[in-house]
Amino acid sequence: MNNPSETSKPSMESGDGNTGTQTNGLDFQKQPVPVGGPISTAQAQAFLGHLHQVQLAGTSLQAAAQSLNVQSKSNEESGDSQQPSQPSQQPSVQAAIPQTQLMLAGGQITGLTLTPAQQQLLLQQAQAQLLAAAVQHSASQQHSAAGATISASAATPMTQIPLSQPIQIAQHLQQLQQQNLNLQQFVLVHPTTNLQPAQFIISQTPQGQQGLLQAQNLLTQLPQQSQANLLQSQPSITLASQPATPTRTIAATPIQPLPQSQSTPKRIDTPSLEEPSDLEELEQFAKTFKQRRIKLGFTQGDVGLAMGKLYGNDFSQTTISRFEALNLSFKNMCKLKPLLEKWLNDAENLSSDSTLSSPSALNSPGQGIEGVNRRRKKRTSIETNIRVALEKSFLENQKPTSEEITMIADQLNMEKEVIRVWFCNRRQKEKRINPPSSGGTSSSPIKAIFPSPTSLVATTPSLVTSSAATTLTVNPVLPLTSPAVTSLSVTGTTETTSNNTATVISTAPPASSAVTSPSLSPSPSASASISEASSASETSTTQTTSTPLSSPLGTSQVMVTASGLQTAAAAALQGAAQLPANASLAAMAAAAGLNPGLMASSQFAAGGALLSLNPGTLGGALSPALMSNSTLATIQALASSGSLPITSLDASGNLVFANAGGTPNIVTAPLFLNPQNLSLLTSNPVSLVSAAAASAGASGPVASLHATSTSAESIQNSLLTVASASGATSTTTTASKAQ
């Protein structure tokens, strides 16, 4: 055979021929490397197919796939020429790579035990690396000046292991992966680099290393990485060679960064985001941030809005609140901390600069921070004298108009908005202090039927000829059919005090009324208007009810008997309405615009009259909703300016007046009558005022409602209105005071 140095020269010049006879072009450290096992063409081709994507890191990198494609024909020739030379194993290997040395650092790894089969596989992999280096070297002649030294880790010297098995890289790698055997990495270094082998030995993770890539995946990933990425993705490999020394690295094991717990160099591409080391630092920053933010006068919403405008990351108030309360995840808090820190520094710097220049500079619209950070508005404080003036204005008018608010603001030298807000708050306070006495939960209050204020039509103006208009004020109350009815207060507009407050005493819900008269038959609704005038208090009361009457009396008829009513009413209305001296109740009804049908007075008590009223008479003046129902189940009593004494009540206690103005309040609360005691239509007649006076109206055989009174004094000082009951109710009581 020729000299190895002489053989390598024509091989490098031609670029083809036996790849096993190529050298690295160096004249020192010429040592033969034993290579064992015959290599067939198919095996060499399969081996090169697995390693054609290996990329070497050095001064100039080229794709191994291109170089292997260029040398595919020479590889086949190499395989053919190696077969006859393998029987003489030592001379052929000596001619293959005479200038490379294999350094085994077996003593550097403690506790590593390899079975003979694993040692054989390890050495076969070293053979594969040598062959790949030779193929790459023959394809890249410009790299011929760079030497390669392979340092591998093994438990026994290489010379003690026979190299008789053929190279089957793919199968052995799969076996090693199944056994979770972590092979050591191989590093090709310039031989002039005086490095200890221990520097290139990588301490592998335990056998359960996560994410162990297969060899095929590794070989396809390596060519896609650049030199910088290859170096950055291998934090476990530290190349301490001199700057002038070109270096190559070949990684045979999966390239993965080691856990942070191992003492390895940090990644070259460390994140630019500064991550806090532990949670304590985050807690301290969150606490400090909250204190400084409050000191600067910014809200959490201001901070989130400012970060969105200044840094492009818009955060809600909830996010800032959770950060301060440490309710975010550690990762999100780490992301948020630098932004909040930057905003806080900017806000403090701007605040300090503004304080030095002018105290109000931070609030100017020209400032960058204030444009997106609104200062918290200070609480408005009103002086005592201004508050007293506002209270006085509130007592005069609780709901002033916009012009009045402007006038008050000008007088007090205050802002109009402040005055408006004060009045609004004061009205709410008034509602809390003095809530409305009557419950407004009714679905159909009387206020919907009679708006307040409204004037009585067709009855009162014809009876009272005063110059002032008679008005009616109705407070919203529960409907009379509601079981929660306690009292119905109807107050008129009078010059006197509220002693004339009327109280309505109503029965329980009409659904339980025990009216069992078989002779009671439904009839069209009747509107009974009883107009009485009292000279003592100059009070006019109008009671409108919708009631069915018994059939023997006729349709829409009611009989009212009052012995002393004639003289009392005539005396009160003689000067005003110009009525004759013998004016009766029928005459007053006719004067009011009604159309009564008079019967012979001999059939009734003195002053009695039979009023035949058409439902349409008052229907035009009142709301149609009032006349829609044809049944009435509530007894109402309206008393003002005095009442009947408690001794004049019926013995059975069917009716009780309460809250009278002229006499002491014997009964202080409305008294509900038991529906079972309301036998209005079973007895003839029914005395609602005095049982002793009931005999006066006994001649009325078929009266459905009979009211009697023996003295004029009781009628003068009281206004009595009674309606019969027979089912559901639709009753409205209105009262007005004449001026």
UniProtKB/Swiss-Prot annotation:
Keyword annotations: Activator, DNA-binding, Homeobox, Nucleus, Transcription, Transcription regulation
Entry-linked SMART domains: HOX, POU
Annotated POU-specific domain residues: 274-348
CDD domains: homeodomain
Gene Ontology MF terms: DNA-binding transcription factor activity, RNA polymerase II-specific; RNA polymerase II cis-regulatory region sequence-specific DNA binding; transcription coactivator binding
Compositionally biased region (Polar residues): 1-11
Subcellular location: Nucleus
GO terms for cellular component: nucleus
DNA-binding region extent: 375-434
Region of interest: Disordered: 1-39, 67-95, 253-277, 353-378, 489-553
Comp. bias intervals (Low complexity): 81-95, 353-364, 489-552
GO biological process, one term: regulation of transcription by RNA polymerase II
Family: Belongs to the POU transcription factor family. Class-2 subfamily.
Subunit structure and binding partners: Interacts with NR3C1, AR and PGR.
Protein's UniProt name: POU domain, class 2, transcription factor 1
Species annotation: Gallus gallus
The encoding gene: POU2F1
